[in-house]
UniProtKB/Swiss-Prot annotation:
This is L-alanyl-D-glutamate peptidase. Endolysin with L-alanyl-D-glutamate peptidase activity that degrades host peptidoglycans and participates with the holin in the sequential events which lead to the programmed host cell lysis releasing the mature viral particles. Once the holin has permeabilized the host cell membrane, the endolysin can reach the periplasm and break down the peptidoglycan layer by hydrolyzing the link between L-alanine and D-glutamate residues. Induction: Expressed in the early phase of the viral replicative cycle. GO terms for biological process: cell wall organization; defense response to bacterium; viral release from host cell by cytolysis. The gene is lys. Zn(2+) binds at H66, D73, H133. Keywords: Antimicrobial, Bacteriolytic enzyme, Cell wall biogenesis/degradation, Cytolysis, Early protein, Host cell lysis by virus, Hydrolase, Metal-binding, Viral release from host cell, Zinc. InterPro entries: Hedgehog_sig/DD-Pept_Zn-bd_sf. It comes from Escherichia phage T5. Its cofactor is Zn(2+).
Amino acid sequence: MSFKFGKNSEKQLATVKPELQKVARRALELSPYDFTIVQGIRTVAQSAQNIANGTSFLKDPSKSKHITGDAIDFAPYINGKIDWNDLEAFWAVKKAFEQAGKELGIKLRFGADWNASGDYHDEIKRGTYDGGHVELV
């Protein structure tokens, strides 16, 4: 099946580095699920707010890769909606990003697997799971 980014995803993609845009476009071609780009670049203030809200485990908001356009957040878009609890769908899209990065020779790190163990369950146990986060290394 062929998917296409919508206006909001394109707007978010336009804020990040070209390498990350390429990877996201290739991942969309490879993914078994449609997905949306929830966020590209963000400010230090937005990062600080995410920390305050408990949606970021960073201690220093200036360390976010989103600030420099080196990160995006995606979410699978299935049957017309995002199911934030469908961790298997997030993992499947993460695998598409992983394959896209390999094909394009672009190194990535994933919030679903910070330690590159090949499993997201350990990230959940540590409280560091960020399933839709992809960043350039």
